[in-house]
Amino acid sequence: DYKYNPDFDWTTWASWSKEQSDNLGRSFNYPHVAAAQWVLYRLARFNEGLVKTHPWQTYLQRAAETSIAMTELAPHYAQFGQMEGDVFVAILDDLYAEGMNALADKLKATMKARADHWSELAYPFGSEMPWDSTGQEEVYMWSDYFGYDAKAAVTLSAILAYMPTMPHWAYNGNARRYWDFLYGGKLSRVERQIHHYGSGLNAIPVLDNYRENPEDLHLLKVGYGGLLGAVSNITEDGFGAAAFHSWPSTLEIDYLSGDYGSNFYGYAINSSAYLVEDAELGYLAFGGNLTEEKNSVTMQLTTAAKNAVFVQPLALWITLDAGAVQQVSFDKKTKEVQLRLAPKTEITPFAYVNLPEEYALDYEKVRGAYKIPLQAKPITLTLKH
């Protein structure tokens, strides 16, 4: 038993009884657990010595079973798009990549039933608190996955309606959010919240759509604003605030962590760099430092993970399951791409590089990714059509 401080008020809606705490019917808790299991799977699968308790298969199976259990044990709220719900797409992709087809088929059928329901609704953005831009992320991802293009377009339009781009750190890519301070803030009131987790989560579908429409720089600006907004509420000592108070009389973070974890999830899973050529602005780097020469342009990555880069002139999306990209270079004439990988570490002796089918490397393939032995010094890969 844990002794609770008797000086606190334990009679509010936020204080749950044992019976309420044991209730499995709140679907919004399931993506957190599924994501945790999925991360353990990927750490065990692609790195050495990080995860020792169970084999990687156990964690991927648990992630999938948790995802399915959400619809069985929490069917009411599972009808809505979930915060962090795009992790279910990632879990499904990995199940198929690993050949766990029976479990993958079951998860796919479960999620398609939800997407079928959304396809019949004009604006399927309900939620526990449906006014707060929480359902769009997963609704877009599954609508896009299952080919409900019109519904994906409606969802993206809704996101862009409340996620602006402007030259201001607080409002660029800031998704609509007003009410969570009232219920979960140290300073409790209704106000425009700066970079609540709506920013980090809604950036996921925006950047996903940008990679499908790489001529639309507006999408990149909005999506990257939301992506970086997700880390703007981390203090120097590492505290993650739910959001920043926008009232001119305050202008400071809220001193409760609230739901910050979902924002950090949005940054972690969506962290990526973009090398872009724009007709008006020339070459640009999002998530990196740019150096341009006569025949080439180079971007040194500055993102946290350094495991994803998009070369916009080629619409080339490169992701790593392990390892890190130090820089990417693009030859303007030959369209050749050079990818410099960071040296090996004790836990990461190999890089696992995912490329489109039209690009091939002379390395072994493991579940669709090129397994590349890293060295004590950086190595460079040359990518050609």
Label for each model-derived stretch:
Residues 1-384:
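Catalytic domains of carbohydrate-active enzymes that cleave complex glycans
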